[in-house]
């Protein structure tokens, strides 16, 4: 996978993950082109399209479009399944995810994506393991944010 974009029906970019090095200018150009292309397509049209030298795979869930660019030899159906698995993980974590969850908790959405995909390849296939890792990270964050006394810090209590 070269990149993943999440954008709204209004064309607002909500999440972007790039797995290939590109300049900011090129990223903006790609994003603008793809958002326009995908939003212009009718709902009954195929979720795969050829674009430049890549294949674009996208799926709409509620008000969000999940859009991935893959290389010519990659499997479109597996990519659709990757998108679906990511949505399932977001649903499990947020409890029926919506666009606002991603807007206000974008760092969690990125963290979930990073636990699931590494370098554009699936890192962990088990939803349970991904969610367990996220739970552990949440616990660590809560621990770090909990105020402790000086005596606790140096281990005297």
From Swiss-Prot:
Subunit note: Adaptor protein complex 1 (AP-1) is a heterotetramer composed of two large adaptins (gamma-type subunit AP1G1 and beta-type subunit AP1B1), a medium adaptin (mu-type subunit AP1M1 or AP1M2) and a small adaptin (sigma-type subunit AP1S1 or AP1S2 or AP1S3). Binds to MUC1.
CDD domains the UniProt entry points to: AP1_sigma
Function: Subunit of clathrin-associated adaptor protein complex 1 that plays a role in protein sorting in the late-Golgi/trans-Golgi network (TGN) and/or endosomes. The AP complexes mediate both the recruitment of clathrin to membranes and the recognition of sorting signals within the cytosolic tails of transmembrane cargo molecules.
Gene3D superfamilies according to UniProt: 3.30.450.60
GO biological process: intracellular protein transport; melanosome assembly; platelet dense granule organization; vesicle-mediated transport
Top-level lineage group: Eukaryota
The name this protein goes by in its record: AP-1 complex subunit sigma-2
UniProt-listed InterPro entries: AP1_sigma, AP_complex_ssu, AP_mu_sigma_su, Clathrin_sm-chain_CS, Longin-like_dom_sf
PANTHER family named in the record: ADAPTOR COMPLEXES SMALL SUBUNIT FAMILY (PTHR11753)
Subcellular location per the Swiss-Prot or TrEMBL entry: Golgi apparatus; Cytoplasmic vesicle membrane; Membrane, Clathrin-coated pit
Taxon lineage: Eukaryota, Metazoa, Chordata, Craniata, Vertebrata
Membrane topology, from the record: Peripheral membrane protein
Family: Belongs to the adaptor complexes small subunit family.
Annotated S-S bridges: none
Gene from which the chain derives: AP1S2
Disease tied to this entry: Pettigrew syndrome: An X-linked syndrome characterized by intellectual disability and additional highly variable features, including choreoathetosis, hydrocephalus, Dandy-Walker malformation, seizures, and iron or calcium deposition in the brain. Intellectual disability is characterized by significantly below average general intellectual functioning associated with impairments in adaptive behavior and manifested during the developmental period.
Gene Ontology cellular component terms for the protein in this record: AP-1 adaptor complex; AP-type membrane coat adaptor complex; clathrin-coated pit; cytoplasmic vesicle membrane; cytosol; early endosome; Golgi apparatus; Golgi membrane
Tissue occurrence: Widely expressed.
Keywords: Coated pit, Cytoplasmic vesicle, Golgi apparatus, Intellectual disability, Membrane, Protein transport, Transport
Keyword Membrane: yes
One example GO MF annotation: clathrin adaptor activity
